[in-house]
Each structure stands twice: as structure tokens, then as C-alpha cells.
């Protein structure tokens, strides 16, 4: 089954006040028996101002000066996202993410800034909530449910985390492990 894994890196926690810096898109074909990456894109977004929180920037480690040298305006970024969806015929493909509501809210804000309609499918599967449901049923250890904790439980390398595309790849591996349970 095809799934579109998404992740964002942002300047803070509120889409009303903070900006989307990068978007990772990872198209996968996944079943219990396999996980294959079919396509990917990593988009860097440039804004006129950032209102960056120190906490967010220390987590994602993005240098805004270097970022701005390769980043594109929100409208162009939205067009690239929609082109990725069109190219791969993903209009009805479920989204997958870890704490995906966070990413979807920032993407919605990005598309508003880009004055563009999103072509994302609205249904999604959230690996954080999948993990929490397993915790409720005592099928996995109790405790934190962040991506690092879940990835480490499954022995998935987390060293490249906090890069939108790398986080997509980690989330895809986590999703693959979760559907096996």
C-alpha cells in the first residue's frame, strides 16, 4: 500500500506565529513484509521574517543564513509539494507522520502564506497515536511516545533526526514496525 510520509522543521510550536523551514515528503510502498521508498523530496522554505524560538532552532540546528541561500519562497514550495502529489498520483493516498497534526497545521499555514490550495489527502495515520494505543494495551513499554523513543524501541537509527526528510525516513521505518504488531 502506498503512503505519503510527511514531516516539517519549524521555527517554533505555533503555526500562527512561527514558520515552516523545511518539508520532507517520502512516498513509500509498505506492507508487513516490506518497506520500499518510491520517491522523495526535501523542500527548504525562505520567509521575509522568521520569529524563531531559541528552543526550536536548537533542536533543528538550522542555520538561517545558510538556509536562505538554498530556500525558496512559500508559493514555490507549495507548487513543488503539489507537483510531487500530482506526479505520483497521491490525491487519495493516506498521509503518515509522527504527531502528524503538528505537521499538517504548519503545512496548512504554509499553503495559506503561499496563497495556494493544498492537494494533500486529509486522512492520515499517526505513528505517535498508534504507539500510544499499543501502550494502552500493554503491548509496548509505557513512557514517552516521541519519535526518538519509538525509533529506539525498534532499534532504528535516530542520529540524523530533526531534518525533515531524515525524520520521514525514520517515521516510515517506525510505521513499518508498527503495522507488524
Where are the predicted features?
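Conserved non-catalytic scaffold segment of RNase H-like nuclease domains
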Residues: 1-108, 148-156, 162
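Short alpha-helix plus adjacent loop in nuclease-associated cores
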Residues: 124-141
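Conserved protein kinase catalytic core
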Residues: 13-15, 132, 173
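Acidic two-metal-ion nuclease catalytic site recognized across multiple nuclease folds
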Residues: 152-153, 165, 169-181
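Short, surface-exposed recognition loops or helix-turn segments adjacent to catalytic cores
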Residues: 121-125, 160-168
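Substrate-recognition/cap helix-loop segment adjacent to the acidic, metal-dependent catalytic center
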Residues: 101-125
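A structural motif
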Residues: 139-150
